[in-house]
Amino acid sequence: METTYFAIIIGSIFVNNVVLAQFLGICPFLGVSSKVETSMGMGAAVTFVMALSAVVTWLLQTYILVPLGIEYMQTIVFILVIAALVQMVEIVLKKVSPSLYQALGIFLPLITTNCAVLGVAILMIQKEFTLLQGLVYNVSTALGFALALVIFAGLRERIEFEEAPKAFQGVPIALITASILAMAFMGFSGLV
């Protein structure tokens, strides 16, 4: 049965959100989500890297790895592609927006090892999507990641102004907030 683009988009953004349902990309989700602006920048960078990696990894898998019978090299090849794309994003951000480059700090190079980027590239191949379906899947998954990141950052900014018991301040309240956000996203599970 052919997967519709609408189902891919809704499923990737809301139902199977890469962070809140599949638990991929937790490190940047917790690390960069203290401010909405930083979260938006990280979301944009991840979206750009995922979109480019979708095209490049699909082409490499389809036209090089499978014909040569070296599918076992998939993970290594995908990591190299993602690393090269992240370096490109880092160079562009450093020139275009030095403030965002500074705000993202160590998390920008960590996109290379962000399991969400690699995991989505591998899932795209496992689901046997066409190039266009894979691109839609990767971009919508990245948008879902960015949406969760920005919502979570907004919640964390509001929590800073509230009085929480000492035991819950910092990471504990962030994890509780993330779990409530994940439960809220579970409400979308009947959509697709």
Can you describe what each PLM-predicted range is?
Residues 5-19, 69-84, 135-148:
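Structural signature of hydrophobic alpha-helical transmembrane segments
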Residues 37-48, 72-78, 100-111, 165-173:
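Cytoplasmic-side transmembrane-helix entry/capping segments in multi-pass membrane proteins
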